[in-house]
Amino acid sequence: MYKGILKYTTIMMALASASVFSAQPPSSPMSLNSGQTLQNMPQVTMQAMDNAALRERDARRLASASEPVLQFAEPIAVSITPEADWTSLPTIQGERSYSVWRTKISSPGALSLNLGFEEFYMPEGGALFVYSASGEQMIRPFTAKDNEDHGQLWTPMITGDAVIIEVNIPSDKVEFLRLKLTSVNHGYVGSDLQDVFLESRIMSGSCNVDVVCPAGDDWRQQIRSVAAYSTGGSLFCTGSVLNNTANDGKGYFLTADHCGITASNAASLVTYWNFENSYCREPGSGDSGGNGDGQLNQFNTGAIFRAGNSSSDFTLVELDDPFDPAHNVYLSGWNANATLNTSAVGIHHPNVDEKRISFENDNVVRTNYSSSTPNNNGTHVQVIDWDLGTTEPGSSGSPLFDQNKRVIGQLHGGSAACGND
């Protein structure tokens, strides 16, 4: 058997709020709760794209890439602001007037959409909502708590080819709102949300092992530290949260340099937590190589670039916001010792798929990238072959753990796949 080598290293209407003068923002879109319908809602439609052609383009690129990064969406540059289309509707009971603006964004044929706002500042008491045209999918409200020094906001994906952007804001605060949509990202690979078109999915190999399987029982804490993430609304990789010597709970997130995070685009990072199948699919089965049932509804958005190095292929960012306790994120330990005498475990998201786990029972080797010669001063750790599971495009940046459950590197590249461990 050939042994694959792996190297780690958003019309305006005036409404009233029953919570008069409260600074609390609305928890759901007022346009949906008011019983009022908005006629002639502004719509912006993107030019149609050929999803199959985009996937074929990427397949050619990935076939020759030694450092594969999975692209799942095509960015479309736009410039959309809520400076027009402000219309008033009759107010309802209460004393404080709220204003609502919304518009529909469509990209025909998209399997998913996500949005990038290069200008975002939400005054206290206001909220931005992004939801599907049917109203069935809705991202949590973005409020003043999401204001950051870099002034940007990037959203997680929503399934389908149309979304509605809605702003609810106290009318006396409208002049302070800053909002500019600059990127509509047309998903052509898909996601594992339930109503994605199954025939368009690029699925991970059947030999992969779901983290919910018994094989992952000894790694439950470490599994909670690993996330799939997107940058620029178009590229997917994997990364992990690390503890630090101050034990202060900061969100230091480790991934691969070749995944392309820089100081200029770190604000666009969106991490997805607990994106996992709900049951163990038997490794090697058609079920394991098929569509999963994981959800992409637990996320952090935005980060600050802290460090990176191309030779060892690492990037470290600090996530903008604290972790939501409901997401149960774990901060993994790490081991920077030069001497390695350990088996290894990889936890990762292959091909934008639910989280998987892989095992190497033999000792890993310290070496350099593109070399198989042992080198105690090398920049990389080599996994000669996986004994259970594998890694694939999308796994890049995922952590490699030693036998003591400490991170010793992140996935750089290699030729592993089902049948080529």
Language model feature labels by segment:
Residues S107-N114:
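Extended extracellular/luminal ectodomain segments enriched in beta-structured repeat modules
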Residues M1-F21:
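Gram-negative bacterial Sec-dependent N-terminal signal peptides
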Residues S240-G251, G389-L411:
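Catalytic nucleophile loop of clan PA
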Residues Y121-E136:
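Short, surface-exposed beta-strand/strand-loop-strand elements in extracellular ectodomains
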Residues A417-D421:
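A short, polar/charged loop-to-alpha-helix boundary motif
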Residues A256-C259, P350-N351, P393, Q410-A416:
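Short beta->alpha transition motifs characteristic of CBS
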Residues I158-I384:
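Serine endopeptidase catalytic core focused on the charge-relay Asp
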Residues S22-W101, K145-N243:
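Protease-domain processing segments flanking chymotrypsin-fold serine proteases, especially trypsin-like
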